[in-house]
């Protein structure tokens, strides 16, 4: 009986200890649940507050970025305005530099200006020695110069010369061969006329006599080409292919065209010379 009691008592003790443990383990759970419930409400408030704060920070950063962008744009526009002002408004140094360049340029141009003044004086001097030979010529600047007896050689042939621009022209109405006209021009320290360009050709055709006149263009058999008497260059564009050298090796001028013919024929002589080639 005693062993059974001990055994029984042992079993009861063991069960009671388990019950006590169960009771002990169950007792602290209630305050934990209460504690969790107590702390869960403030944590949600903190999260909401942090979210609002982050949103405000994002809005602030966005506003700052927009402000900085606008400021940079305004600064860029201001810089462009200043650059344009600097480029468009000459500074004092630029003005001084331009003045210096103008002074240097005027010094460089003085020889040319002196030459132009000299030519102008020569032209005025030649014009002062001339007289108008026709009413129509008054609008063209054409003037006739009286021919001396020595120049006319007493033959009474009509002669006149006129200056236009930088060139002077001498018309000798005494008909001569091409070689005779060349010699006549050389006696007067002139040369048979060389036409420099198309404008001069048209001008001479309007004022030339109705008769054909010899000019200083002839065919060179050695060069196989048409050359001017002084071998100088000319900007006059000539279609030399249309001139058949069998018709003649010397060129003449009429009111309508240039034409080649027999050099032994007798035509009017046209001499010419530039004003800057006359002796002072």
Curated annotation (Swiss-Prot):
Membrane topology annotation: Single-pass type II membrane protein
Keyword entries, A-Z: Cell adhesion, Disulfide bond, Glycoprotein, Lectin, Membrane, Receptor, Signal-anchor, Transmembrane, Transmembrane helix
Ranges annotated as spanning the membrane: 45-66
Superkingdom of this protein's organism: Eukaryota
Sequence ranges assigned to domain C-type lectin in this UniProt record: 156-275
Glycosylated residue positions: 104, 239
Gene Ontology biological-process entries: cell adhesion
InterPro entries named among the record's database cross-references: C-type_lectin-like, C-type_lectin-like/link_sf, CTDL_fold, Ly49_N, Mouse_KLRs, NKR-like_CTLD
Intrachain S-S bonds: 163-168, 181-269, 185-271, 250-263
GO cellular-component term (any): plasma membrane
Single Gene Ontology MF annotation: carbohydrate binding
Residue ranges annotated as Cytoplasmic topological domain: 1-44
Cellular compartment(s): Membrane
Residue intervals annotated with topology Extracellular: 67-280
Assembly with partners or alone: Homodimer; disulfide-linked.
Described purpose of this protein according to its UniProt entry: Receptor on natural killer (NK) cells for class I MHC.
Protein name per the record: Killer cell lectin-like receptor 7
Organism: Mus musculus
Gene: Klra7
């Amino acid at each position: 009986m005693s062993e059974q009691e001990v055994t029984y008592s042992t079993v009861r003790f063991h069960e009671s200890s388990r019950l006590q443990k169960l009771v002990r383990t169950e007792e602290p759970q209630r305050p934990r649940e209460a504690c969790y419930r107590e702390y869960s409400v403030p944590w949600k408030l903190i999260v909401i507050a942090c979210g609002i704060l982050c949103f405000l920070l994002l809005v602030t950063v966005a506003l700052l970025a927009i402000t900085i962008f606008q400021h940079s744009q305004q600064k860029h526009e201001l810089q462009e305005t200043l650059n344009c002002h600097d480029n468009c408004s000459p500074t004092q140094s630029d003005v001084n530099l331009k003045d210096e360049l103008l002074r240097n340029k005027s010094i460089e141009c003085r020889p040319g200006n002196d030459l132009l003044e000299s030519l102008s004086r020569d032209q005025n001097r030649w014009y002062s020695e001339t007289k108008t030979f026709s009413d129509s010529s008054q609008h063209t600047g054409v003037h006739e110069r009286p021919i001396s007896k020595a120049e006319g050689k007493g033959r009474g042939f009509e002669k006149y010369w006129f200056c236009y621009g930088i060139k002077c022209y001498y018309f000798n109405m005494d008909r001569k061969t091409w070689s005779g006209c060349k010699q006549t021009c050389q006696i007067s320290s002139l040369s048979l006329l060389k036409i420099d360009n198309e404008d001069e050709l048209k001008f001479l055709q309007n004022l030339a006599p109705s008769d054909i006149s010899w000019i200083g263009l002839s065919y060179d058999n050695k060069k196989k080409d048409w050359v001017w008497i002084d071998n100088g260059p000319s900007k006059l564009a000539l279609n030399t292919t249309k001139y058949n050298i069998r018709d003649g090796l010397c060129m003449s001028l009429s009111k309508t065209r240039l034409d080649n013919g027999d050099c032994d024929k007798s035509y009017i002589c046209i001499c010419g010379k530039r004003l800057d080639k006359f002796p002072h």
